[in-house]
């Protein structure tokens, strides 16, 4: 069985791991609740036998597991109805849920309840996860060069936690690996689809001008230097910056 590793520098996560580790020798019921794609299931997999995982959407399997096993891990726990009828006695039960209702029943059923914080509250985890996904996706895409995509912290998509972070890194790696021919092909496809009207040149030339100037300003930190690099007058550059609403 493949070893599952959970990457985190978060004190909150380390405390959850500590609590779960201490419970390995105890017959107790534990609930881990948090937003989707925060790593709840991966965290539990890194500590417990994956063969004990039961989908809460399958009520028959849940009942069967609770009747026959001493250790049961139930994911999609929020899908279970009539939680109060579940028998957790003399068992180690770990439930994983995206949300919970009936808090008074939950409080009675579980000895320990851990809240998994979303990634936006675990910024200290981002460098680890970004490096991990860069290496993983580079292998997946068979990118041989040691490419380091430009990551802007303020632009990282955490709306769906780890899922959207990975998608963001995937996109950045693809963009970082594009050749001149690739870029020309992308522009060709876009322009073929969208070219219309009677002022198309002026409307579409910013597809080239805006990223050119934005990248230059970020790289050279100076309008004067950039105007020299581009071979245009500084006033012309300033005018373009205003026209293109570049901050």
Model features per residue range: what roles?
Residues 21, 25-63:
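Walker A/P-loop
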Residues 72-76, 91-99:
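Structural recognition of the conserved hydrophobic beta-strand(s) that form the central parallel beta-sheet
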Residues 34, 54-85:
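Conserved P-loop NTPase "ATPase switch" module shared by AAA+ and STAND
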